[in-house]
Amino acid sequence: MLQVVQSPHNLVFMGSIRSVVACLSLAAVARKMTAATGQSVSGTSAAAAGLLRLTSVPGYDHNRVNDVLLLRPAAETQRRCDNETQNLQDGNDHVVFFPGDIQNFQQEMALQPDAAPWQCWSLERVGLTLAHRFPGCHIWVIRASQMYLHKFSCYQNFVESNLFGAPEHSADYGAIRHLRALLGHSMQQAGLPNPLPPLSGTSTPGPLPAGFSLTIVGFSKGCVVLNQIVYELAGARADPELQLFLDRVSALYWLDGGHPGGSETWVTDKCALGELASSGVAVHAHVTPYEVRDPMRAWVGREHRHFIKTLEDLGARVSHKLHFEDEPASIDNHFRVIQEF
């Protein structure tokens, strides 16, 4: 999360050694990924990196659309996995990533003075990093539907939000339904062989594709979508189609969640967390001092601790880690958690 109280120019750490190191590390990841695919990541064309950009993909209603970036599994990795495990779900493992503030497509970041220094965390670069982290999976990067001042991500299609992206959570906004439909339409547009079927609205829905599994990752502002999903779990389970979809979610990753609101950075409602715990989904929380040790936003750390303790008390499958705990809090390390988790 970019802190609104600061000048945008103060957020740009032009001379940061850590930023340079992080960008070089990302470049190394990109080279490794493209060596596996035989493709290039140089230049501004996402297609050159094996990335497919889908624009204005609709969700469950045509008023909610998102741009989506897809990186298919490297063919070599997929063949190796298929040979090792007969029931590898036919390459039907998927990872959905919700980015944070300032993260956008590379070309668009290059045009914005405040965003240009952070191009190594563009949607394309992060997609390549995630492909390295989750080999053999389809990587889906969901661009926020609005970017106020080209910096502040707003996930209005998933959760009621103000211009700066601060959420107002509810139990029935439709984030899960939108994600289910958005992913299905994206698969169809990308020409994947086993797409999710369209939502039918019937009480006896057809089965999902064999072996379909989903991991959902949120970073910084993107964690508001995961929080909204948690608040919707109880209601969504009453819907047969959404229940089938939720049953295929294997893991949720919160990466240094943050937003400009004054509370609810982490879910603390015990009933909502009870639904999450009973789902059996693996919960992973990775944080840095930038968010959980900021004295000006002390509630973030308190809420994070409450989130973890409540889930542990409820018997959830939860893991957590504080990264860079011996280093000063910095926005550089905030971004680097994407590499380290």
Curated annotation (Swiss-Prot):
The keyword Zinc does not apply. One of its GO terms (cellular component) is mitochondrion. It comes from the Eukaryota. Keywords: Electron transport, Mitochondrion, Respiratory chain, Transit peptide, Transport. It is found in: Mitochondrion matrix. Residues 1-35 form a transit peptide. May play a role in the respiratory chain. Belongs to the C2orf69 family. This is Mitochondrial protein C2orf69 homolog. It comes from Danio rerio. The lineage of its organism: Eukaryota, Metazoa, Chordata, Craniata, Vertebrata.
